[in-house]
């Protein structure tokens, strides 16, 4: 959690880092999703450059232990992961709606900055339409809530009267 928190980027930082990665490593496309629960890099033509990219990111964040916390998902598995993220099937609370909005905001920022390239743009567009189908054709979002809402509901089950509880 400590490392994940230190990796959080605001939208401006995401795009700046995206430009740096695309230029430095001659990538065919870059998108960086950074939320309170995840920082993910969607990169095109990066498979033979991953060690150098991770090394650059360790320097960027001044985190020499970053490599130990990074995992990569490539090719079709990476596409499936993006679709799961967009559909909120890979969220702390299954079906929560925030991640799709965050992903759309990221898409807009990176598209406006001309960083997505010819592969990521249609891939993200398809992920959004798939997410819409998941939400409308399944029950995955029927009880979707935020993490904070879920925490309050759990607290209600644990304590008889929340008004008598102190939260720090």
Question: Where is each model-derived feature located?
Answer:
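A glycine-rich (often HGG/GG-containing) alpha/beta subdomain
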Residues: 1-91
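Glycine/serine-rich phosphate-binding loop and adjoining beta1-alpha1 elements at the start
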Residues: 65-163
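Conserved class I S-adenosyl-L-methionine
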Residues: 165-168
């Amino acid at each position: 959690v400590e490392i994940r928190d230190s990796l959080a980027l605001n939208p401006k930082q995401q795009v700046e880092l995206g430009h740096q990665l695309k230029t430095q490593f001659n990538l065919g496309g870059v998108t960086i999703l950074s939320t309170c629960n995840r920082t993910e890099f969607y990169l095109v033509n990066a498979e033979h450059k991953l060690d150098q990219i991770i090394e650059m990111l360790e320097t960027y964040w001044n985190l020499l232990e970053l490599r130990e916390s990074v995992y990569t998902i490539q090719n079709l598995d990476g596409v499936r992961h993006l679709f799961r993220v967009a559909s909120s099937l890979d969220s702390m609370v299954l079906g929560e709606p925030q991640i799709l909005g965050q992903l759309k905001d990221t898409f807009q920022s990176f598209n406006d900055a001309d960083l997505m390239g010819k592969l990521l743009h249609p891939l993200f567009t398809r992920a959004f339409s798939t997410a819409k189908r998941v939400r409308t054709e399944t029950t995955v979002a029927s009880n979707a809530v935020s993490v904070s809402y879920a925490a309050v509901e759990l607290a209600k089950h644990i304590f008889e009267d929340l008004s008598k509880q102190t939260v720090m």
